[in-house]
């Protein structure tokens, strides 16, 4: 039984919407990263459905690229989250001022060059 292309796009759209909700509505950095991963998987489902619909390999090639981007995003994102948690003790994005240049420079000036 072949799944209609409209159903595949409906599933991908629902997953993408769920990922957007998870990334926007939560106040937790891990949930934000999880929401972005759900959105990338929804895009992968849409590309696979389109590749099956039009019998082309480009959709599958895009999925491999998306998987590489997702793996990179998870590894770098979780490393940043672990660093930020060790520094502040919280997963709440509102608690972070780590991206301000002044904060980094003040921290460097207090410690001095190493």
Swiss-Prot record:
The lineage of its organism: Bacteria, Pseudomonadati, Thermodesulfobacteriota, Syntrophobacteria, Syntrophobacterales. It is found in: Cell inner membrane. GO terms for molecular function: NADH:ubiquinone reductase (non-electrogenic) activity; quinone binding. Its EC number is 7.1.1.-. The keyword Transport applies. NDH-1 shuttles electrons from NADH, via FMN and iron-sulfur (Fe-S) centers, to quinones in the respiratory chain. The immediate electron acceptor for the enzyme in this species is believed to be ubiquinone. Couples the redox reaction to proton translocation (for every two electrons transferred, four hydrogen ions are translocated across the cytoplasmic membrane), and thus conserves the redox energy in a proton gradient. HAMAP family: NDH1_NuoK. This is NADH-quinone oxidoreductase subunit K 2. It is a multi-pass membrane protein. Belongs to the complex I subunit 4L family. It comes from the Bacteria. NDH-1 is composed of 14 different subunits. Subunits NuoA, H, J, K, L, M, N constitute the membrane sector of the complex. One of its GO terms (biological process) is ATP synthesis coupled electron transport. It catalyses: a quinone + NADH + 5 H(+)(in) = a quinol + NAD(+) + 4 H(+)(out). GO terms for cellular component: NADH dehydrogenase complex; plasma membrane. InterPro entries: NADH_UbQ_OxRdtase_chain4L/K, NUOK/Mnh_C1-like. Its main location: membrane. The chain crosses the membrane at residues 1-21, 29-49, 62-82.
